[in-house]
Each structure stands twice: as structure tokens, then as C-alpha cells.
Amino acid sequence: MSWVCRFYQGKHRGVEVELPHGRCVFGSDPLQSDIVLSDSEIAPVHLVLMVDEEGIRLTDSAEPLLQEGLPVPLGTLLRAGTCLEVGFLLWTFVAVGQPLPETLQVPTQRKEPTDRLPRSRLGVGLGVLSLLLLLTFLGMLGHGLWREYNQDGQLVEQEVRRLLATAAYKDVVLTSPKEGEPWLLTGYIQDNHARLSLQNFLESHGIPFRLELRSMEELRQGAEFILQRLGYHGIEVSLAPQAGWLQLNGEVSEEIQKQKIDSLLQAEVPGLLGVENKVRIAGNQRKRLDALLEQFGLDSDFTVNVKGELIELRGQVNDEKLSSFNQLQQTFRQEFGNRPKLELVNVGGQPQHDELNFEVQAISLGKVPYVVLDNHQRYPEGAILNNGVRILAIRRDAVIVSKGKREFVIQLNGGKPR
């Protein structure tokens, strides 16, 4: 069974939302909440529920949850259709398909969970006597129990630290708890699955705790959402090696935009420590390529043809020019990676010292592309001929092959070389 809830005050009054199964968080922090509420009275993590087919249970809340005016203990299965309050948050839920009430009748007076009966003086006296006996008994056992508690606590802390030493929690820090205070765990995890596993481990050991963890996946999604909202659709966001850092790749049109992205994300994404900004300025690759061609003395030997993510250098190649091109290509790749890719097109026929002997009769661009050579045999991509030529790629306009450490582009015209 699935469940749907409705809110009855604030900016989201009248909004109905179907609740996802599993751990469900209501709050104002978009990186920690499944259902984001933007009212100023809502805490970053305001209400935590566990949703399944049987119903909805209270897991945690920033303020006491009241059901029809009565406080609800943690772990309680909530009743559908009742008035539910968590501070400013006023809501209810029903099964999907059932009608939700248009308004909620909020109890004007809070009742005690149980009715209290008048106590007689004899009852009070017996209660005081029982309390004194209990305190005496606890005083006798107190020292031994406290020492045993300390020993158990040390063992549990050792187990927790062993868990935090694993790869999934290597960026989580445990602050040793003081007496009467919950354990504080801060740092970074990969995703919410790691958070839930850690939470279940601590709860199973009966440890009072407070998690102040940031999910790296939530950081990535938050940064991606902000960039797309601002129109930076050409930027890809990925996780950097360091905890709390993100890596950006792609293109923007101006240098000022690249500089603004870093400060923008660090201001808008909670928990983000820094950005490895590898964003390129559109057009810089072509300017740099022209400078490299001049630097290596190839500016008069090649013509440049840009095809999206591919840049072709066309010209006659000899061994000396090929060596210079290889150095140029290595420098270009170090600065810009494989996007765009440089490709050398030798328009001067076959190389003098490395005869290819590669005559294309026809090509097929079906599900498995292949070429037909002058021996009437079919060769797919990846095939190696007897003379050592490897077929790297088959395109409509060209076949790319390699021999030794050299690559060649054989231009086609209607499936035949030209």
C-alpha cells in the first residue's frame, strides 16, 4: 500500500505529495530532505519517517510530534487521517486513492497521554517507600554497574571505530562523547545508503548519536541542479578525489563565467569545500592549436577542419612531420584531454616507408560495421590483417586504421577510397 500526505498551513498549504517507501525526510535542506519545505519555521531535518506498506512510523523529529494533540513516542505507527503536528508543520496522510480532508480540526487544548486518577495519602506513602527501597538497591549496585557500563561502552566505541576505518566511512570523524551527550559523527559519505547503514549499526547497539554527515552524491546532484537552473547545460559535474570537493568539465563562452561558477557553487551548495574547475573557454582550443602548429613549424603544412568534437589536420605527411605532429598532439592532449580529438589525415597517398596495402571495395554500417577489401573478405572494427594493419573505426566517409604506432585515415567516396 502507498500513502499520500497533505499540508495545511504555510507556503505549501493544500499541497499533496505521495510518500516514497523507506526512510522519508521532511525538511528545509534540499540535500538532506526527500520532501523540501521552504517555510522559515521548518528545520533542515524537521521530521523523519519510515514508510512501508503497513503504514508510517515516527523515526525522529526536530520537535515533538503530536497526534490529535497527544505526544507520540519514537517508533510509533501513526494513524491515517488524524491531525499531525510537528511545531509549525501541520499535516495528515491517507492511503493512495482515499480522500484527504480539506481542513484539519486542531485540538485547542493538549491532553495528557493518560488520565490521572486521584491518589490517596496511603498510595502516596507506599509510592515514596517503594522509591526509597529502589534507590537503596541501586546505590548498592551502582559502582559495579557503572564499571560494567564503562567497559561495555569502550567495546562499543572500538567497534564503531573499526567500522569507520573501512573505505565507505574513511572520511567520517567520531568525536569521543562526553558523559550524558550523544556521539557526534561528522564528515562525508558517498550516498544515503551509507548513511542508513551507519545509522542502523548505531541504533542496533543502543548508542545515542547525532549525524552531521554530507553525502557526496547529494553534493553532486545539488551542484548539477544549480548549474542547469542557471543555464550552464554544457558543464558536467563529477566527484573529485578529495572528500567535499567536486570536479567540473565542459565549456562556457566567457572567462568571467568560469570564475563565477566556483564562488556560486560554494555559496549555494551546503557542505561543499571546493571545486576543481576544469571548464574550458569555448574557442580556446582552436587558438591554442594554431599557436602549437606555428610552434612546431607545421602551420603551412596542414589545413584545419573542425567537426564538432573532432579536429582534422589535413596535409602531406613524411616521417619528420609525423614526429612533429605526435609531439603537438601530446601537448594538446595534456591541456585539453580527448575532447576535442586531434586526427591526422594524410592526403599525399600511402606513406613512403610503411606501405598499407589497404584497398577498400565497400563498407557496411549495419549493426556490426565492416569493410570489404580487394580480397573480397569482410573485416569488422578491431580486425587485424595479415600485414599488421588494424581496423580502428569505420565511418561513412572514412576508415581509420593503424600500423605500428601510426594511425591513418583512408578517405572514402561512396564506399570507395579516394
UniProtKB/Swiss-Prot annotation:
This protein's record includes keyword Iron-sulfur: no
Induction: At 37 degrees Celsius in the absence of calcium.
Membrane topology according to the record: Single-pass type II membrane protein
Pfam assignment, any one: Yop-YscD_ppl_2nd
Subcellular localization: Cell inner membrane
Annotated GO CC locations: plasma membrane
Database matches in InterPro entries: SMAD_FHA_dom_sf, T3SS_YscD/HrpQ, YscD_cytoplasmic_dom, YscD_ppl_1st, YscD_ppl_3rd, YscD_ppl__2nd
Residue ranges crossing the lipid bilayer per the database entry: 122-142
Claim: Heme is one of the keywords in the record: no
Protein keywords: Cell inner membrane, Cell membrane, Membrane, Plasmid, Transmembrane, Transmembrane helix, Virulence
Chief subcellular location: membrane
Function of the molecule: Required for the export process of the Yop proteins.
Name the UniProt record assigns to this protein: Yop proteins translocation protein D
Gene, per the UniProt record: yscD
